[in-house]
């Protein structure tokens, strides 16, 4: 189903101007964080304009919002009571089952001294563990993990990897789209004892934040983050106070690692973010978006000339983005008084709505405009396919420019525009608007 957008009403007026200024300021701030090459001194973003050509939207599906959209922000001004905060698995255990935290469920720990009491003051849950929180309350001896294998051999641990830093083929969106309770990890808040109830959660990376480039192997786009540095959970047979050596083959083999884990002052422990409660009126729209408009972005970059000496003089290069060609899948989720917006990568879009057949005519036109002929122009989630730009360098004298079209600077600036767009607007990153 296709829909029409009143582009003029949506992008004009005081609200439209304020949104354009926020986008300009956001892109400008991102450029200040970029490591510039030696021949560029600075990059400034001066203006942003939405243009007059609206995008073409076709609704593909209506579904439940992604689990990441329910994460509670640290700076959120909304009341915790009104938002109905619940644990990561979506069940308000703290409010409806207070008896699960009573001491009657902790008395059995005296039977086996090698088991670490999960309700002691110094215990902090691991980022990866077997997802049996309710059984931990009812029977602490149930989790008898395999010695030497942190967290046991349960394959459910695969679903507990945080999705906040993965995208494309690394994101199991089939589970996320269905609102799977394992989509964003498991909350161990239900195991917190009375001494830990009033302790506020420390900051944690959420889906709003992008991954540092240093954590990603750019040479291998399908590589996953290494799990060698992940903090393991304590096996049920290991305890720092157990001196019989029966805690598994890794007991005592890494004393510095165990000392690091048992020292609460060594590093701030990770905790899962709080989640808002799902409501029946929450919904999400997946739509195929096409755009070949006249959005404008004005930038200036100062180029350094090294003759006759290094950084001898700087020349201002003005770049005007006069339009873009876009083809992707947009996600719009409405949750209470918030609208969450993002785009999907090509792999995630194919997994959710399927891939369309390539358009030969569009692919030919894209190749003529300078795009890669081996890449289909109708890549679902391909996002920015073309950026049209005009450049001027130096001051104009008698209507003539000093130089024209400095290719290196153009390629660098446009590559950064693409990177900022895809890192900040492609799931798991998203923008939230209050309505």
UniProtKB/Swiss-Prot annotation:
PROSITE patterns, A to Z: SMP
Positions with biased composition (Low complexity): 218-238
CDD domains assigned to the protein according to its UniProt record, in alphabetical order: SMP_Mdm12
Family matches, as InterPro entries: Mdm12 (IPR027532), MMM1_dom (IPR019411), SMP_LBD (IPR031468)
Residue numbers spanned by region Disordered: 73-113, 186-268
UniProtKB keywords: Endoplasmic reticulum, Lipid transport, Lipid-binding, Membrane, Mitochondrion, Mitochondrion outer membrane, Transport
A GO term, aspect molecular function: lipid binding
Main localization (coarse): mitochondrion
BP terms from Gene Ontology: mitochondrial genome maintenance; mitochondrion-endoplasmic reticulum membrane tethering; phospholipid transport; protein insertion into mitochondrial outer membrane
Function field: Component of the ERMES/MDM complex, which serves as a molecular tether to connect the endoplasmic reticulum (ER) and mitochondria. Components of this complex are involved in the control of mitochondrial shape and protein biogenesis, and function in nonvesicular lipid trafficking between the ER and mitochondria. Mdm12 is required for the interaction of the ER-resident membrane protein mmm1 and the outer mitochondrial membrane-resident beta-barrel protein mdm10.
Written domain comment of the UniProt record: The SMP-LTD domain is a barrel-like domain that can bind various types of glycerophospholipids in its interior and mediate their transfer between two adjacent bilayers.
Protein name: Mitochondrial distribution and morphology protein 12
């Amino acid at each position: 189903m296709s829909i029409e957008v009143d582009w003029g009403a949506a992008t004009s007026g005081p609200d439209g101007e304020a949104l354009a200024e926020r986008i300009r300021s956001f892109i400008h701030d991102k450029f200040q964080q970029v490591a510039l090459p030696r021949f560029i001194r600075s990059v400034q973003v001066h203006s942003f304009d939405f243009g007059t050509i609206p995008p073409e939207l076709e609704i593909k599906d209506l579904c439940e919002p992604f689990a990441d959209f329910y994460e509670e922000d640290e700076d959120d001004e909304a009341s915790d009571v009104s938002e109905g905060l619940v644990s990561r698995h979506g069940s308000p255990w703290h409010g409806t089952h207070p008896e699960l935290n009573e001491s009657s469920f902790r008395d059995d720990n005296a039977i086996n001294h090698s088991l670490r009491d999960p309700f002691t003051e110094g215990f902090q849950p691991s980022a990866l563990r077997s997802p049996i929180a309710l059984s931990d309350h009812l029977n602490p001896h149930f989790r008898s993990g395999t010695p030497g294998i942190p967290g046991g051999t349960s394959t459910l641990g695969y679903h507990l990897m945080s999705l906040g830093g993965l995208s494309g083929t690394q994101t199991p969106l089939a589970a996320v789209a269905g609102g799977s309770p394992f989509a964003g990890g498991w909350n161990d808040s239900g195991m917190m004892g009375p001494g830990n109830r009033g302790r506020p959660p420390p900051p944690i990376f959420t889906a709003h934040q992008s991954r540092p480039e240093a954590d990603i192997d750019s040479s291998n786009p399908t590589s996953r983050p290494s799990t060698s540095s992940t903090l393991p959970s304590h096996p049920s047979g290991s305890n720092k106070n157990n001196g019989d050596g029966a805690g598994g083959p890794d007991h005592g083999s890494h004393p510095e690692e165990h000392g690091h884990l048992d020292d609460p002052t060594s590093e701030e422990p990770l905790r899962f973010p709080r989640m808002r409660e799902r409501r029946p009126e929450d919904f999400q729209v997946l739509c195929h978006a096409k755009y070949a408009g006249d959005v404008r972005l004005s930038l200036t970059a100062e180029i350094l000339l090294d003759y006759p000496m290094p950084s001898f003089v700087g020349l201002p290069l003005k770049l005007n983005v006069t339009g873009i060609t876009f083809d992707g899948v947009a996600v719009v989720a409405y949750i209470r008084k918030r609208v969450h917006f993002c785009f999907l990568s090509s792999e995630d879009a194919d997994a959710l709505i399927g891939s369309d057949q390539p358009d030969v005519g569009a692919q030919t036109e894209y190749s003529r405009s300078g795009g890669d002929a081996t890449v289909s122009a109708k890549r679902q989630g391909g996002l920015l396919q073309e950026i049209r730009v005009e450049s001027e360098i130096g001051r104009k004298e008698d209507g003539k420019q000093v130089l024209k079209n400095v290719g290196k600077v153009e390629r660098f600036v446009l590559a950064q525009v693409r990177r900022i767009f895809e890192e900040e607007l492609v799931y798991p990153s998203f923008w939230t608007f209050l309505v």
